[in-house]
């Protein structure tokens, strides 16, 4: 297991939830956290604890984003007009690595970031190697020709555990996706309940 794969499953164990809906998640086999004290019964969380957990879960879901990076995304969401929690989800789902993951070009969001960083993807015909690159509605994301037959890509397309959401149009024969629109929370196919309003409360303390 790679260091990044281990980190991914550590997030699942820490949250006590299979946050990506993966069949191999260790929480499918046990309902306690990592480490020797993981089986201890957890006490009721304080309001702060509930808010912190919601933030950690959302931050972890998008590839265990660094706190500084996640806070900057939140700050932009807060500056925008409208509901901050909806803005936050929209910004996270507009990331290039998130779209590559949603389009089922790769099996995990961690793989999506690495896939983009290694230059396997173009946006509107231009190679982009920054996972946090923000896509706009109408942008066309394509796997580069030399990368379309990579095993990781071929395996991801056939994954039955998740579907492509309706705000992304995908042609898996050509390995091309169009980001149709910025989604709202209710549009996003999270396998577990995400509570971005609690993230807003956390940063508004």
Curated annotation (Swiss-Prot):
Domain spans labelled S4 RNA-binding: 94-157
Family: Belongs to the universal ribosomal protein uS4 family.
GO cellular component: small ribosomal subunit
Gene label: rpsD
Gene source species: Rhizobium leguminosarum bv. trifolii (strain WSM2304)
One of the GO biological process terms: ribosomal small subunit biogenesis
GO MF annotations, alphabetized: rRNA binding; structural constituent of ribosome
Description of how the protein assembles with itself and partners: Part of the 30S ribosomal subunit. Contacts protein S5. The interaction surface between S4 and S5 is involved in control of translational fidelity.
Ranges annotated as biased composition (Basic and acidic residues): 1-16
UniProtKB keywords: Ribonucleoprotein, Ribosomal protein, RNA-binding, rRNA-binding
Transmembrane intervals: none
Pfam families noted in UniProt: Ribosomal_S4, S4
Protein name: Small ribosomal subunit protein uS4
């Amino acid at each position: 297991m790679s260091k990044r794969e281990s980190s991914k499953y550590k997030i699942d164990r820490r949250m006590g939830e299979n946050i990506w809906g993966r069949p191999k998640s260790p929480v499918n086999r046990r309902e306690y956290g990592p480490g020797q004290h993981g089986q201890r019964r957890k006490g009721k969380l304080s309001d702060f604890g509930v808010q912190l957990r919601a933030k950690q879960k959302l931050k972890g879901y998008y590839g265990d984003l660094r706190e500084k990076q996640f806070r900057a995304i939140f700050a932009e969401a807060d500056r925008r007009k409208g509901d901050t929690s909806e803005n936050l989800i929209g910004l996270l789902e507009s990331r290039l690595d998130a779209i590559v993951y949603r389009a089922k070009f790769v099996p995990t969001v961690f793989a999506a970031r690495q896939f983009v960083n290694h230059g396997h993807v173009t946006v509107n015909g231009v190679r982009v190697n920054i996972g946090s690159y923000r896509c706009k509605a109408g942008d066309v994301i394509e796997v580069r020709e030399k990368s379309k037959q990579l095993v990781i890509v071929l395996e991801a397309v056939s994954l039955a555990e998740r579907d492509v959401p309706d705000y992304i149009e995908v042609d898996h024969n050509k390995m091309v996706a169009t980001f149709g629109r910025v989604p709202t929370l209710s549009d996003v196919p999270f396998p577990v309940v995400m509570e971005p309003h609690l993230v807003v409360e956390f940063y508004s303390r």
